Curated annotation (Swiss-Prot):
Belongs to the class I-like SAM-binding methyltransferase superfamily. CmoB family. This is tRNA U34 carboxymethyltransferase. It comes from the Bacteria. It holds the Pfam family Methyltransf_9. Homotetramer. Transmembrane segments: none annotated. The gene is cmoB. It comes from Escherichia coli (strain K12). Changing residue 315 to A: Slight decrease in Cx-SAM binding affinity. Does not affect carboxymethyltransferase activity. Keywords: Transferase, tRNA processing. Signal peptide: none annotated.
Amino acid sequence: MIDFGNFYSLIAKNHLSHWLETLPAQIANWQREQQHGLFKQWSNAVEFLPEIKPYRLDLLHSVTAESEEPLSAGQIKRIETLMRNLMPWRKGPFSLYGVNIDTEWRSDWKWDRVLPHLSDLTGRTILDVGCGSGYHMWRMIGAGAHLAVGIDPTQLFLCQFEAVRKLLGNDQRAHLLPLGIEQLPALKAFDTVFSMGVLYHRRSPLEHLWQLKDQLVNEGELVLETLVIDGDENTVLVPGDRYAQMRNVYFIPSALALKNWLKKCGFVDIRIADVSVTTTEEQRRTEWMVTESLADFLDPHDPGKTVEGYPAPKRAVLIARKP
């Protein structure tokens, strides 16, 4: 059973303590009524992982844990088998005691694009919205963050996160909660809020931006990464039934339009930090994610278009400040 008690104890002593007015009841309701049918199987995989304290831990350049003495072939096989029980692995990669989890996404490439544009993360309390397996939270800790809190309702991601945490020596500097942002009160408590790969899944993107703003302290920083298309400040793509085979894509603005949206929501010092085409080297099928990936979602005769005929995925990173 995944226990959130450590997180409750941690925030009881800091500026997130007011969250305890609602959070334990939400988590209890989730544990009682909303667990996925495979959750027990996934949580068993976490439970059966060995307790290991890493001799060498690198979160600054990667997410890598090594032991002082190499593990036996049997120990490595046990870890690999249990981690494979948590497939598909989408966000990573992770290198854990000789088990290299080659995830669908090279999330380290995204981090390398984002990191140079951030305010110094040293000592910051961070919220990562739609955090997936938690890869970027570990990189935030590696960059000096005091605490990284991730929210993502996908329960497989929670178990992946807890598995990695266990293999990192039960590190308590990062925590993942199985919630969506609409379940959070206006905490106004985070120095930096990340929303990466979420906005285009929201039916009301401006409401999402307001929700992000409600989590920030005054002068806090928003890091927003999302799909964009080329165009001026009035350009927004509203896909039909699917975009790149995804049904739940609602609005894809230009970077300039997105800048206007942020301004409308009251953000200031808004800047477009990066715009990059998503490549089939960055998102692809691997041994740890064996179903369809980006190459299957692009027009085989024109990789500049999706199979539906829309512009192929391009992503922008925007940085903004809450005044």
